[in-house]
Amino acid sequence: MMKYFITAMMCMFFGSAYVLAGDAEETQMLETKKCVACDLNNAWFESAALRKADFSGANLYRANLEYADLRGANFTGANLSNARLRGANLTGAIFDGATLKYTNFGEANLSNASFVDAKMRGARFHNTNTDGIRS
């Protein structure tokens, strides 16, 4: 637990996004913006710059992606159940076939995003920009 606290504090000091769990797949995502079918359960990508990232097939259960730049990101077939995407920029993101049960999209920008065949039971969209969404 102390390792995670120190990592979080260092990254807050330097003003960058940080990952609390600190495993190899999360580091890979931050470095390459590609982590197909990765297990990112409980990952912490708050305020991360992940434009056009490929999360296809990834497990992002309970992940924190609040205020992240995810424009054009690919979440095809990903599990984002109980994930937090509040305030995230998801313009043009692809959620086709994704599981989004109880996902929080509050205050996010979802303009021109695609949700074809997405499972969205209980998802929250309070004050969310949904202009041009495809489903």
Where in this protein do the model-derived segments appear?
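Positively charged n-region of N-terminal signal peptides that target proteins for export
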Residues: 1-5
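Cleavable N-terminal signal peptides
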Residues: 7-8, 19
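N-terminal signal peptide c-region/cleavage motif recognized by signal peptidases
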Residues: 14-16
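Tandem repeat scaffolds
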Residues: 21-135
